[in-house]
Amino acid sequence: MAEVGEIIEGCRLPVLRRNQDNEDEWPLAEILSVKDISGRKLFYVHYIDFNKRLDEWVTHERLDLKKIQFPKKEAKTPTKNGLPGSRPGSPEREVKRKVEVVSPATPVPSETAPASVFPQNGAARRAVAAQPGRKRKSNCLGTDEDSQDSSDGIPSAPRMTGSLVSDRSHDDIVTRMKNIECIELGRHRLKPWYFSPYPQELTTLPVLYLCEFCLKYGRSLKCLQRHLTKCDLRHPPGNEIYRKGTISFFEIDGRKNKSYSQNLCLLAKCFLDHKTLYYDTDPFLFYVMTEYDCKGFHIVGYFSKEKESTEDYNVACILTLPPYQRRGYGKLLIEFSYELSKVEGKTGTPEKPLSDLGLLSYRSYWSQTILEILMGLKSESGERPQITINEISEITSIKKEDVISTLQYLNLINYYKGQYILTLSEDIVDGHERAMLKRLLRIDSKCLHFTPKDWSKRGKW
């Protein structure tokens, strides 16, 4: 059995952790770093095939030294600080880009052919049929719900102009480790999931204090209290373009409010692993969702979008802060992004790759929105109601490729007597109705006060 002193960076061994059911388990983990505090060694571990947000510092008592695997010196991959350059099998290291090609045996309905209701052996409660059209290639999201990343096509070169861009080239030993222990934001204390490039001198602090209105950071509670006596903001900068009840949205220009935008990106990076932070926020707009009480407008989440997108992206980054997750706010952010696209008269899609949580939220939103349209179709003169994929896209502002991939994901497309039938089974309908009963938060278009700008005519934004 190995000794504690023999453990080095790059070793792999089982590590004790508690799972979601509060049961002990011993998953395989990799040692990313070792540090000594007052003669006591601590080991920073990444659990193989688990999300990086679960990485943590552990003591030697949680390590199974009998099954340790030392790094191989003859590894062909270049190493850095004793670590292999890649981790096959770790989902956050492998950017999964799945492309499902529809073969002649599994055709997709034409975008413009009308659809109509069609019964199927009495088992279907509602059905929509589309006339056969040309076969097309469909770029679909992957179907693994635990996947960290997803794409709808061949990856393009990383953009180097945004505030948060998709790029793994800086994924080294430093950025693989969480560097902020805890963040105090208003009445919440947040435990970061990932690395964020805050100034080095702040990474040794037990708590990083943020002003919840301007997002400036301080070293201590005293610094924050001193700042609050001078900060007169009680809401994000920019224009309030939506308010209903306690929920508001503020539109923030990344050029006009550069400091706030950069601070927002630093905070967001603590909870987004698939993006690399850059400081050029000028080409971006930020839409911050807040919850109002007597003390002000408290940030709940946000999404950003490019002022000019050549690829129809209506979201660049999207995040609901951890204290507000699993409460319907993520779907509300997504719904708001499509509401803006409707006002702009465009269809939109989120920038890929999506995080695992983002992918789940988008799949759920697309499914509910499309099913809502299909189930609301009315028949005329006793005939089956008809609709095309283009019409679904125009009504919802969801890009056609996302409409098709969602229909495939829900397994609604069937070929029957020369027609493409979209069949809604009892299970699909019942599941949708149950989900909609739980979806209490919705965007009210009448409460939106938004005038889109033509950024192509505004020079350098």
Curated annotation (Swiss-Prot):
Gene Ontology annotations for the cellular component aspect, listed alphabetically: cytoplasm; kinetochore; NuA4 histone acetyltransferase complex; nucleolus; nucleus; perinuclear region of cytoplasm; piccolo histone acetyltransferase complex; spindle pole
UniProt KW keywords: Acetylation, Activator, Acyltransferase, Centromere, Chromatin regulator, Chromosome, Cytoplasm, Cytoskeleton, DNA damage, DNA repair, Growth regulation, Immunity, Innate immunity, Isopeptide bond, Kinetochore, Metal-binding, Nucleus, Phosphoprotein, Transcription, Transcription regulation, Transferase, Ubl conjugation, Zinc, Zinc-finger
Ranges of biased composition (kind: Basic and acidic residues): 90-100
Pfam families: MOZ_SAS, Tudor-knot, zf-MYST
Region (Interaction with ATF2): 316-461
Domain Tudor-knot: 8-65
Modified residues (Phosphoserine): S86, S90, S147
Record flagged with keyword Nucleus: yes
Any one GO MF annotation of this record: transcription coactivator activity
Gene Ontology terms: biological process: cellular response to glucose starvation; DNA damage response; DNA damage response, signal transduction by p53 class mediator; double-strand break repair; double-strand break repair via homologous recombination; establishment of mitotic spindle orientation; innate immune response; lipid droplet disassembly
InterPro entries: Acyl_CoA_acyltransferase, Chromo-like_dom_sf, Chromo/chromo_shadow_dom, HAT_MYST-type, MYST_HAT, Tudor-knot, WH-like_DNA-bd_sf, Zf-MYST
Subunit structure: Component of the NuA4 histone acetyltransferase complex which contains the catalytic subunit KAT5/TIP60 and the subunits EP400, TRRAP/PAF400, BRD8/SMAP, EPC1, DMAP1/DNMAP1, RUVBL1/TIP49, RUVBL2, ING3, actin, ACTL6A/BAF53A, MORF4L1/MRG15, MORF4L2/MRGX, MRGBP, YEATS4/GAS41, VPS72/YL1 and MEAF6. KAT5/TIP60, EPC1, and ING3 together constitute a minimal HAT complex termed Piccolo NuA4. The NuA4 complex interacts with MYC. Interacts with ATM. Interacts with JADE1. Interacts with PLA2G4A/CPLA2, EDNRA and HDAC7. Interacts with the cytoplasmic tail of APP and APBB1/FE65.
Family of the protein in this entry: Belongs to the MYST (SAS/MOZ) family.
UniProt-recorded name of the protein: Histone acetyltransferase KAT5
